[in-house]
């Protein structure tokens, strides 16, 4: 068993505040020993692991955080590999399940062709860097997903449904199967479900059954949010999780591994604003994804990736109606054009200008721009504006819920409309005038809307409604390896820590529908298997006193600008002047009243800008004997400040020589 010195232990412990942990977890025997008589025999030195210093309330081989698809797959796989597992879930049972429970239950499938999947997912990265091993791992899973779900999770292949070309009630589901038909490898990509249905929780229920079928190996703790990871401060090994249960904190020992499967941060407004630059929005999926796992991973040194990547909705520029907190938002004109997003209907932002093609079929919130599909930049406020005729068409088609129709406010003129929604009337007037021109001429020079989806405003009445951006899910989180290991900022695996699912998803740019579920299953399997593997014993520590002689204030100081001394001969003089950053110091040698040498003793000028002046000018001062002659020397182009400072320093030295 490896031993680590007390010096190394304390160094790491102090870095993570573990001294407080040790003190809080010390047994009563420690205080008893401390109060013993000084004449007592010295206590025997003991060796212990960091885990020995923590008071544990429960112990498992593997702790899984989160009970969505990723967590359930990780737990099931770990159990099948011989581990005793606990899933800790922040929600009560009826609210658990994350996005998995409420999503479309669609899974990306490459019809057995891994190479096609690799080509496709590489293209979806849009030129962004992503490790080939990650592409290989997701492609392996997506290519074989039909067999994986049948062979490992008990789904019936005879019930599978391919959604390619399927249109349901005006919703063109086939538009996502594949979602990017222009990309290489698309011919093999499709969306499948495990039975003839969607958005019904069927896949979630089947995965959950795999957990309940393993009650001898898997415990589930509902209403038990993970609060922090417990980490050895020296080796950085994650040895357990602190969980809040029944109002108390409990430390759960994880002998072999911890899997973070806590989803994204779409329900954390602060994180959404910080990472996605989206202010006013409404989430669509599970309402409890608040970035908990991301913050816990950061606290133990995890690197983050893809934090600016997210998926939105499927129509009307990915905006939606505002909803109360905790209520999933509606999807509008999903994968379709209808009375809401065609005709005399536009979206304007805070300044009254259009910012998006309202009729475009949106790909998970992504809109086409210069050869790539990206999330639009949403203004602070968004307003939906229609005319009298359009309102009638919406009502006739039943394209908008009655409660939302009731929120439309009528205005008799554009000026009244502008005042009512708080935008500049001149700009809004120009916006509507331009849109009418685009509609009449069949060409949208602002946002590229197709002619058949535009109609000029009738000028009778204007109706407006406040809207917000719709957010389906986020992709960012702790960076992971192809082995589902969570990586630190140096690219090294944090020992015993794994992740799967949307908490650090693999999507870096464009997103194929069904990939999040596919990666929950793919990386859940990898994480569960690797977390279950028996690990080497933790190192032990020997605590003993050491002597030290620390440097005192002032002993070590690299501060620029401190007074320095320089050696000079009888005919040498030190000149100084302020450069771009620090002072420039020269030693000038004077013979018979003229400069014979200039040495630059100190400079902190910028490489490639100021430094050339310090290298080229000194020889130009040789032979000069007056301030005027020195200042007349041509400076170095692009280094005026450095050149002038150097001249000033040389003049300063020459004046000393002349007395």
Language-model segments: residues:
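Active-site- and interface-proximal helix/loop "cap" or "latch" segments in soluble metabolic
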Residues: 566-659
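Glycine-rich loop(s) and the adjacent beta-strand/alpha-helix scaffold that form part
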Residues: 253-321, 517, 523-526, 530
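A glycine-rich dinucleotide-binding beta-alpha-beta segment and adjacent secondary-structure elements
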Residues: 228, 427-507, 599-603
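Beta1/beta-strand and adjacent pyrophosphate-binding region of the FAD-binding site
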Residues: 56-68
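Conserved redox-cofactor binding core of oxidoreductases
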Residues: 140-248, 269-270, 317, 439-459
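N-terminal secretory signal peptides and thylakoid transit peptides that target proteins
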Residues: 1-17
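An anion/pyrophosphate-binding glycine-rich loop and adjacent beta-alpha core
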Residues: 294-296, 303-423
């Amino acid at each position: 068993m490896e031993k680590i010195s007390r010096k190394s232990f304390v160094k790491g412990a102090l870095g993570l505040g573990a001294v407080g942990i040790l003190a809080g977890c010390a047994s009563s025997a420690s205080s008893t020993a401390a109060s013993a008589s000084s004449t007592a025999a010295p206590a025997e030195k003991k060796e212990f692991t960091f885990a020995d210093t923590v008071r544990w309330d429960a112990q498992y081989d593997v702790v899984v955080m989160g009970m969505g698809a990723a967590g359930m797959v990780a737990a099931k796989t770990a159990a099948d590999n011989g581990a005793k597992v606990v899933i800790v879930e922040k929600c009560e049972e009826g609210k658990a399940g994350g996005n998995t429970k409420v999503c479309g239950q669609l899974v990306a499938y490459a019809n057995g062709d891994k190479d096609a999947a690799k080509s496709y997912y590489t293209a979806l990265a849009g030129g962004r860097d992503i490790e080939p091993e990650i592409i290989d791992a997701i492609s392996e899973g997506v290519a074989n997903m039909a067999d994986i779900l049948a062979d490992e999770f008990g789904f019936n292949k005879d019930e599978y449904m391919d959604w390619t070309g399927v249109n349901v009630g005006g919703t063109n589901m086939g538009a996502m199967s594949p979602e990017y038909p222009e990309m290489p490898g698309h011919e093999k990509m499709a969306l499948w479900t495990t039975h003839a249905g969607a958005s019904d929780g069927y896949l979630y229920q089947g995965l959950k059954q795999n957990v309940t079928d393993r009650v001898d190996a898997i415990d589930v703790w509902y209403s038990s949010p993970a609060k922090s990871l417990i980490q050895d401060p020296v080796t950085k090994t994650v040895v357990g999780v602190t969980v809040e249960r029944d109002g108390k904190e409990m430390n759960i020992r994880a002998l072999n591994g911890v899997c973070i499967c806590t989803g994204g941060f779409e329900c954390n407004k602060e994180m959404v604003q910080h990472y996605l630059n989206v202010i006013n929005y409404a989430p669509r999926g599970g309402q409890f994804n608040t970035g908990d796992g991301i913050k816990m991973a950061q606290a133990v040194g995890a690197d983050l990736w893809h934090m600016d990547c997210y998926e939105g909705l499927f129509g009307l520029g990915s905006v939606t109606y505002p909803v109360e907190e905790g209520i999933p938002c509606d999807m509008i004109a999903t994968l379709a054009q209808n009375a809401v997003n065609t005709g005399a209907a536009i979206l304007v932002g805070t300044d009254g200008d259009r910012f998006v093609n309202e009729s475009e079929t949106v790909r998970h919130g992504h809109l086409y721009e210069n050869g790539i599909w990206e999330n639009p930049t949403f203004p602070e406020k968004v307003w939906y504006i229609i005319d009298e005729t359009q309102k009638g068409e919406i009502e006739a088609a039943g394209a908008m819920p009655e409660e939302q129709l009731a929120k439309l406010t009528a205005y008799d003129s554009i000026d009244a409309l502008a005042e009512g929604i708080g935008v500049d009337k001149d700009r809004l007037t120009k916006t509507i005038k331009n849109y009418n021109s685009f509609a009449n001429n069949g060409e949208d020079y602002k946002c590229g809307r197709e002619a058949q989806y535009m109609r000029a405003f009738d000028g009778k009445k204007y109706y407006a409604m406040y809207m917000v951006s719709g957010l389906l899910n986020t992709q960012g989180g702790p960076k992971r390896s192809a082995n589902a290991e969570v990586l630190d900022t140096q690219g090294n695996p944090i020992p015993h820590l794994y992740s799967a699912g949307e908490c650090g998803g693999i999507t870096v740019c464009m997103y194929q529908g069904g990939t999040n579920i596919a990666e929950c299953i793919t990386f859940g399997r990898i994480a569960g298997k690797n977390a279950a593997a028996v690990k080497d014993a933790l190192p032990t520590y020997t605590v003993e006193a050491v002597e030290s002689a620390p440097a005192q204030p002032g002993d070590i100081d690299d501060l620029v600008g401190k007074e320095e001394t320089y050696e000079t001969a009888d005919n040498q003089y030190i000149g100084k002047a302020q450069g771009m950053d620090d002072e420039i110091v020269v030693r000038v040698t004077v013979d018979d009243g003229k400069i014979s040498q200039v040495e630059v003793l100190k400079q902190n000028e910028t490489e490639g800008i100021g430094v050339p002046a310090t290298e080229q000018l000194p020889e130009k001062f040789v032979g000069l004997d007056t301030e005027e002659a020195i200042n007349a020397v041509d400076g170095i182009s692009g280094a005026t400040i450095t050149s002038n400072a150097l001249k000033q320093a040389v003049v300063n030295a020459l004046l000393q020589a002349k007395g």
